[in-house]
Amino acid sequence: MIENSFKMEMHFKNRWQAASLFLRYPRTVTLCLSGKSGDMDESVNLSTSMGDVEASMLNHNVSFSSTMVTSNGDLSLPKLSVTLSAEEILKLRSGRPKNAVESPHAGVPMETSLAAEEEANGDEEEESVRVVDIEDTLELTSNGNEAKPEDQELAIAPVLQYFQGALVELGRRCWTSSTEAQHYTKGCYWSPDGTCLLVPVHLDGMHVIEMPSDLYSADTVQPARSLTKLQSEVHVPEGGTVYDCVWYPHMNSLQPETCLWLATRQHEPIHMWDAFDGSLRCSYSGYDAVDEVMAAISLAFSHDGEQIYAGYKRCIKIFDTSRPGRFCDDYPVKFAISCIAQTTAHPHTLTCGNWHGYIQHFDLRCSHKQGPLFTLGGHKGGITQLRYGEFGNGEWHLFSGARKCDKILQWDMRNYKQPLVELQRHVDTNQRIQFDLASDSNWLASGDTRGFVNVWDLKKYGDPSVLPLHSDCCNGVALNPAMPILATSSGQFHFTDQSAQGDNVTLNGTETTELPAPADVNQNQKEVLYENAVVMWWCGQTG
């Protein structure tokens, strides 16, 4: 309540003037409509109204649904008149509780009270500066040197050195295949803290594999290190073909509530899975025009983790992470969204790839009728992956890959008329072949259908280093964000003739099974080589 004897008139043309006054003077005054100051029952608390206005401004989100557009009539407030008479002030004073604390500036003019408060704030700032003065907090040792805090060295993240020598295999996990069930991997994804690896497997769900425990504190690895048999700590059984999956960006194994990932599967809504026990936490459902559940094609978290971007055949749905269910904002598009990428510098824009081979950049604050801000081409197949890399001074480069396309295109987003660099790899199938960028944006690694891993040094832009790591298609490549460890996954769907019973089938490159052939079947034999594996490699310094 106001304790000062003053009288003022305020007229607001709109809510923005009222909100600006409230932010400058966040006090509680009495608001009377139509200039009626004598009747206190008709008064309205201005702080409550201005609080609602401020919350309305701060929560003013862009709506992508035509039914959620706010009319212009809702953006204006009637002219308000505020009048405080001496009788009202006395009435307010007499109505205070008995145990109320008397303000030290009660009964003085408002200008004097504000001056006293500013002087008190100045004294507090001087006292605060004196208390936290850096000279008072330094500790000196006996020889006069300044003592360093114990955690100062831990606060500085070490610079990871990738590909400093020959790769050392750390461990692997294999899945068998047959002509009836081909369990090939579909990529691999390191968690943001680098402790575990997510591996989707065809007809076998999703697996979470932990990094070997002896590597957490390792600076170097001996070439003669014994192999670790990688095991699945969490297994989510197959419920449908996995289209895409993504980790929560702030995942930390020391905080179990953050250990989760999203996955979209065939004929299912988006599911959030717990990385500790594999339980289902919640679901985010997208529905079509006839109210049937649609499966998302691609997924992405916002960098703060508060929103989920899901790409569908004709729209982008934006879910609030804290609100599971079907409530979302729709942003209509013309093509199916096959992959999504975003920069930290522009949280309101999305870069999306589609099955027609185009890359489109959308500003979600604009109407969908405006269309994309720009469209990029250059690939002959559908876009399978997009990845942004920061090269310092706010310089963002976009890397794009496509199916049945041997090129990885690097785009400078300051001038995107043509690609900056074309990086060549070998991709001759429709399968998604992953590539990954190092945390310092100095190295780019990609698999190919021949089983090789191509590594480019982005500081030199020379020919890639070709590493023959697999005997089957290398579909997944992931660089650990916390350790110099490279994870690769292999496997693909092999087209075999079910009637050709005389084929030689090789499982994971270790054993060969020759099936008997009946007399009436052609004896032409065909060798089919399967290698469905995920392997971890040490790519740092070796001892």
UniProtKB/Swiss-Prot annotation:
Region ranges (Disordered): 95-128
GO molecular function, one term: RNA binding
Disulfide bonds: none
Extent of the WD repeats: 237-283, 291-329, 378-421
Subcellular location: Nucleus, Cajal body
Record has Transferase as a keyword: no
Highest taxon listed in the record's lineage: Eukaryota
Keywords tagged on the record: Chaperone, Nucleus, Repeat, RNA-binding, WD repeat
Gene Ontology cellular-component terms listed: Cajal body
Keyword Coiled coil among UniProt keywords: no
GO BP: Cajal body organization
Principal location: nucleus
Chain intervals with Acidic residues compositional bias: 116-127
Free-text function comment from the UniProt entry: RNA chaperone that plays a key role in Cajal body formation. Specifically recognizes and binds the Cajal body box (CAB box) present in both small Cajal body RNAs (scaRNAs). Probably acts by mediating localization of scaRNAs to Cajal bodies.
PANTHER family: TELOMERASE CAJAL BODY PROTEIN 1
Family: Belongs to the TCAB1 family.
Stated name of the protein: Telomerase Cajal body protein 1 homolog
Gene: WDR79
